[in-house]
Amino acid sequence: MKEFQVYLELDRSLQHDFLYPLIFREYIYALAYDHGLNNSILVENLGYDNKSSLLIVKRLITRMYQQKHLILSANDSNKNQFWGYNKNLYSQIISEGFAVSVEIPFSLQLISSLEEAEIVKSYNLRSIHSIFPFFEEKFPYLNYVSDVRIPYPIHLEILVQTLRYWVKDASSFHLLRLFLYEYCNWNSLITPKKWISTFSKSNPRLFLFLYNFYVCEYESILIFLRNKSSYLRLTSSGVLFERIYFYAKIEHRVEVFDKDFPSTLWFFKDPFIHYVRYQGKSILSSKNTPFFMNKWKYYLIHLWQCHFYVWSQPGKIHINQLSEHSFYFLGYFSNVRLNPSVVRSQMLENSFIIENVMKKLDTIIPIIPLIRSLAKAKFCNVLGHPISKPVWADSSDFYIIDRFLRICRNLSHYYNGSSNKKSLYRIKYILRLSCIKTLARKHKSTVRVFLKRLGSKFLEEFFTEEEEILSLILPRASFTLQRLYRGRIWYLDIFYFHQ
């Protein structure tokens, strides 16, 4: 992105924040396809789902200068060829270039805010595991929690009208309406889920931009309501715009993204309410009374209905006590557990027994959803009994073992923060036995004969613990350090969670 910064600044200064002329720039399409100006991707004439070469882009720009090719109508057909390609291909190329250009004002604003705040970029700030230390620090002292699912989709005209406050180019909005008209029925106030699926697959970058902008607008109003509802100003949050190539952290506010599926981790905290969000699910928690939580519940409902014209049922937002309720977030079931302890103190001839109760956040692996996912992937049945993977039986032994080990290590890496590792050991056992059955199926043997031939140490990597790896790296590590790594470990290199 840095190599195109000069071009972006030049166009921005010449066009006075007009984005429409950017679709006539070749480097915009190079950004869209993640390759340089001197490179191209050769494609066959197979339709508009393929990547476009730079030669096609040059032809398209020439045609846009010469005629009104951007005017598409319902009479256009897939059979109408245009220099060997149909018009849907050109529409796809332009929409992806437009998705890049519409991100530029927000990206430039993010860069300037980073420079003003003198924030040092670090990849560790993107980790979604950074939210769990926040949970461990704050949630044991809170009383109530509420799971909130951000309603989506909304009517796309509302999105376009909201964008007009940030981008001054009216031509860009007419072009955006043109692209959206190809995928939905504008006569309906409720966008069907089928249209959302089609739109997200055809142009994921533009879809994610619109969705992230909608969430950003929603959270900006949420912060405004928070400041108006309290005499104490909220100082631990800020408004930044994050796209595919940018991230930032300001005090207690973290934004997280992934190149393939941009998703934002965002939270703020204050003495009254704590807010955490990942993708479309958010958590509201407070130490105050249920009345305070109900007030925020109806704040959100009226905000969605009156500002975004999205209907949300109040019964779907539940308010629960943290001590009696487990909430599901980022692949973990989390709850606050009471940990009683008894301390005996003796002073001269008198002894005292002091009972102390400490609250501790428990993070539990959801074993049933994980087994359901493994059963869907054909690693086991619905009861959790391991089965062979016949699809991989034709591959080499090294490939089969490597695939199983990779899945096992990824799961172990992510769920090493669990309070109880027994569920993780069960998942490892399922994958280990599934791997053995797959190899035995390939060699036309039984599991017992196969293990007897290879020995009992076969596939022991499945049960390799993190402290064993650390002992190889740090052979002189103390016993205290080894005990430390038997506990919960949160990693700062996990950038997204695939559900």
Curated annotation (Swiss-Prot):
InterPro entries given in the database record: Domain_X, Maturase_MatK, Maturase_MatK_N
Keywords: Chloroplast, mRNA processing, Plastid, RNA-binding, tRNA processing
Gene Ontology cellular-component terms listed: chloroplast
GO biological process: mRNA processing; RNA splicing; tRNA processing
GO molecular function: RNA binding
A Pfam family matched in the record: Intron_maturas2
Subcellular location: Plastid, Chloroplast
Lineage top rank: taxon: Eukaryota
PANTHER family, per database record: MATURASE K (PTHR34811:SF1)
Function summary: Usually encoded in the trnK tRNA gene intron. Probably assists in splicing its own and other chloroplast group II introns.
Record-stated family: Belongs to the intron maturase 2 family. MatK subfamily.
HAMAP family: MatK
Protein name according to UniProt: Maturase K
Taxonomic source organism: Gymnocladus dioicus (Kentucky coffee tree)
Gene symbol of the encoding locus: matK
